[in-house]
Amino acid sequence: TVMVDNRVDRLPFTPNVHQFNSDNTQVNWNGLLGRLELIARPALWLDDVRIFPDVAHRSFRVEITPGRLTGDRSKGMVTVLATSFNHGGKPHRPPPVSAPVLAHDKSSVITLVLPLGDEAKLWDEFSPALYRIAVTLESPAGRDDREIEAGLREFKPHGTQFTINGRTTFLRGKHEAGVFPLTGHPPMDVNGW
């Protein structure tokens, strides 16, 4: 059973910060949309994986939070491997990095630095080279895998403008508040998005 409870007194936000409770764009977006699935995981699994690009050092910092069900210390080995793709050249595969995992409390975080070397492919809108970063956690309880796509880029302000990897860029977008689809829910297919 799944219960969706959108009562305002149960949501942690200030008044009128979203269309959910704005007089101008209030809608009833209750329910669950999109793909729902239940996945079996080992007793020690990859609860969260976060990727942080570091252009200056040509590397990714990978923060891994293991999840566990038991109260005892859980042991395993985590491995991170990156492979570039979508850039038209030979895939770049730097050597993988590994570290032991000893999950002893809910705040255990393993931080690994994955050096990419001088052949690292940078990402920007004109050269959108990406890496598939495969994270594997192996333990006596089983194996859990996660794959994340990430680009090696540095986004920062420069005077009154922004740069990506030192190149001036312009951010484009649009605001679509108060848009009500005829179906009563957002599109659920690729073409609609």
Question: Where are the model-predicted features located?
Answer:
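Secreted/periplasmic carbohydrate-active enzymes, especially glycoside hydrolases
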Residues: 1-193
